[in-house]
């Protein structure tokens, strides 16, 4: 990651190790800035062969998990190369529901987006809907210039998302 100039990402433990202990999952981390830098490196083919870039983008575009996240509220046919992340649940708190991706707009421009929801009390459907709404709002802003209304979301209980 340092070689391709991607800051703010640390990978220490395997998925198997993470599954054994709740606290271990927090040793692997990526800030939104780091995730975006990684996607920029992928998009710009930094230190990556054309074949590897093509394969990674194909796998990310055809990914089935997370269809209700970044892709969820976008127009049918919108190309989204993305990678989800989902953490464990303990005492009703989900440690992470994330999606990062490269969204291709109808005019060929790209939006690189990272949405992280962490330590949430909200159910999975709500968390995924929030990610989808954020992606839709960003795409609406970039394609129409209009700021979408997001006033329906409230913050009353820490970790709980309500509409």
Identify the residue ranges that each predicted region occupies:
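Structured C-terminal helix/loop/strand segments within mature extracytoplasmic catalytic/sensor domains
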Residues: 36-79, 84-163
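Mid-domain, small-residue-enriched loop/turn segments at the edges of structured enzyme/sensor domains
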Residues: 1-47
């Amino acid at each position: 990651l340092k070689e391709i100039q991607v800051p703010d990402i640390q990978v220490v433990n395997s998925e198997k190790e993470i599954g054994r202990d709740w606290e271990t999952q927090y040793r692997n981390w990526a800030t939104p800035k780091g995730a975006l830098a990684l996607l920029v490196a992928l998009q710009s083919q930094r230190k990556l062969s054309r074949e590897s870039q093509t394969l990674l983008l194909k796998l990310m575009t055809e990914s089935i998990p997370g269809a209700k996240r970044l892709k969820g509220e976008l127009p049918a046919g919108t190309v989204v190369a993305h990678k989800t992340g989902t953490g464990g649940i303990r005492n009703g708190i989900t440690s992470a529901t994330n999606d990062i991706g490269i969204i291709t707009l109808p005019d060929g421009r790209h939006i690189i987006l990272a949405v992280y929801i962490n330590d949430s009390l909200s159910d999975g459907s709500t968390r995924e809907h929030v990610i989808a709404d954020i992606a839709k709002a960003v795409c609406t802003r970039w394609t129409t210039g209009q700021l979408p209304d997001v006033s329906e979301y409230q913050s009353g209980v820490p970790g709980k998302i309500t509409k």
